[in-house]
Amino acid sequence: MRHLDSSIPDYVADQISDRCLRCYDEQQWYGKNFLFDYIGDLDVTGKKILEIGCAEAGLMKFYNDKGAICSGLELSDIRFNNAMLLNQDQSIYLFQADICKPITYENKIKDTYDIIIIRDVIEHIPEQELALKNMYDLLSVGGKLFMSFPPKFCAYAGHQQTVPKILGKLPYLYLLPNSIYVFYLKLIGCPEKKIQYLLDTKRTRITISKMKKIINRIGYDVQKKSNWIIRPAYSFRFGLPRILNPFSWIPILNEIFCNGMLFLLTKEQR
């Protein structure tokens, strides 16, 4: 079976890659099995929720089914088209835009949001502080922002797990100097487009300490944070139990052994 959501018609599933169908399943699973409880709002009926980098918008489908008023912003043509195909019967407002460029979304957003979610996306954005400042402006007073990302020096911060060949999936491989990294990737037959993606990701990675400084400068309040050695999504992907990083209190080790850093931030009245 190519996907877990039996409500997806075959003619829709046939237009979408197996990987993206699995991402759609994971997005719904993540909302149901982790994020809903982590954010802590027992009733989201009527709440306005925006996901930045919604991809297939499976997470927004979960919240839409819970009664929330959901919107999804996506930059990628492929992922946006996937979202439109998969959510044809959902009342989710989907639009293409760049969170770093308000001109691309200001005519599509008419109100502020109670909850904004940016899950494993911020590490791909070159202008991270600008993106988070723009999200702050889109958040209602008292609203919450959930953000997750793999820190700069963790085992798979370079996203090399997406390389097709097993020899490209080695932990910490991205820490090689670029010239050696590219040579190795070419040697194992990695496509040029994938190599460029990996180099782009390597360039935009961010440390936990730098992210904390950005959060403070913008004016977010930290309601909750957690540092995971086996992050929640790994339960879906690999059947592993989620485990907090036992070294989270030790500088450097808190970065190296963290495979997922999570923040729940709020915008308070000033």
What does each of the following model-derived ranges do?
Residues 14-18, 41-42, 123, 190-194, ...:
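Generic signal for short, ordered secondary-structure residues
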Residues 118-121:
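A short beta-strand submotif of the Rossmann-like class I SAM-dependent methyltransferase core
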Residues 101, 123, 154:
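Active-site micro-motifs of SAM-dependent methyltransferase domains
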Residues 126-134, 144-264:
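S-adenosyl-L-methionine-dependent methyltransferase catalytic module, highlighting the catalytic core
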